[in-house]
């Protein structure tokens, strides 16, 4: 496990209360460990972090996407707070290297488990909020999510809906998605999905089936636009 100083440097934030940071990175498996004296883990912080993230992302979208209606804003927010996006933020922070877990959880692939990375990322947001204030937390979230927020094309946010709307407008049957390959261990699988609309088809990969479906839809939309 790497030192917390590196993580704080990536966040551009130094915790005043280091115990909050430790709690945010403590996996629930530690509660079953006889040598672990503290009963705190990241589950309660994750609950708070989820709410803080939704609030901040909603405010950012409301401010930056003035011409988008409620439905489109909801689609973008759904993309920005989904497991895949949160895990990509966690990956930028190399958060898997900092999660405190039992040896058994680590051997079982806990460091690459997307649920663990998502939960720890949300817990970290809550820890920053409790250690500072909503303004500081807002600035950190806006920085970490910047590359995802700046995407203006709704196709990139919700490619499956965009592909479905294209199919309906073109009088085609709705897109059909089929899982064609699964590789890797159960805790770190890569899925390949094939999407087909009429005579058009394209594949996409991802660490979750939904992510693979979105990537397949996005690839097919890009192909249709270039044909």
From Swiss-Prot:
One Gene Ontology CC term in the entry: cytoplasm
Compartments it resides in: Cytoplasm
SUPFAM superfamilies noted in UniProt: dsRNA-binding domain-like (SSF54768), RNase III domain-like (SSF69065)
One GO MF term attached to the UniProt entry: rRNA binding
All residue ranges annotated as the RNase III domain in the record: 4-133
Residues that bind Mg(2+): 46, 119, 122
Catalytic activity: Endonucleolytic cleavage to 5'-phosphomonoester
PROSITE patterns associated with the record: DS_RBD (PS50137), RNASE_3_1 (PS00517), RNASE_3_2 (PS50142)
Family: Belongs to the ribonuclease III family.
Assembly and binders: Homodimer.
NCBIfam families reported in the protein's UniProt record: RNaseIII
Protein name stated in the entry: Ribonuclease 3
UniProt organism field: Rickettsia peacockii (strain Rustic)
